[in-house]
């Protein structure tokens, strides 16, 4: 995130905002949904487990990224579906193949979450 320039395309916020605007210009009558990434962990080169919920790797934690995604969606009229806290959480390790990538059960939970949004 670049506080001085919210259109900075080298940031997640700036790139996401630009992408949303491009879709809105090209397809003005569609409703856009953004699905967040699910919770996950990974192991660094030293064998340390990185918890993306609390460990800042230099550009913020995953929660920072989620907040930037939510803000970009809010400012641009895009529906945001939270899978990070809403579908796959730190308790759902059986939904991940390697601590981060979804397995079949994880994909089904994401699909269920997506389906619930459309039923509302």
Where are these regions (language model features)?
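Alpha-helical cap/lid subdomain in secreted, periplasmic
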Residues: 1-119
């Amino acid at each position: 995130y670049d506080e001085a320039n919210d259109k900075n395309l080298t940031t997640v916020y700036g790139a996401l905002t630009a992408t949303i605007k491009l879709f809105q210009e090209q397809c003005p009558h569609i409703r856009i949904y953004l699905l967040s990434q699910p919770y996950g962990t990974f192991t660094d080169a030293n064998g340390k487990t990185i918890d993306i919920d609390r460990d800042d790797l230099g550009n913020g934690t995953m929660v920072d990224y989620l907040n930037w995604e939510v803000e970009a969606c809010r400012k641009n009229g895009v529906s945001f579906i939270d899978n990070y806290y809403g579908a796959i959480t730190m308790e759902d390790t059986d939904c991940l193949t390697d601590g981060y990538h979804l397995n079949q059960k994880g994909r089904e939970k994401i699909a269920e979450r997506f389906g619930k949004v459309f039923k509302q």
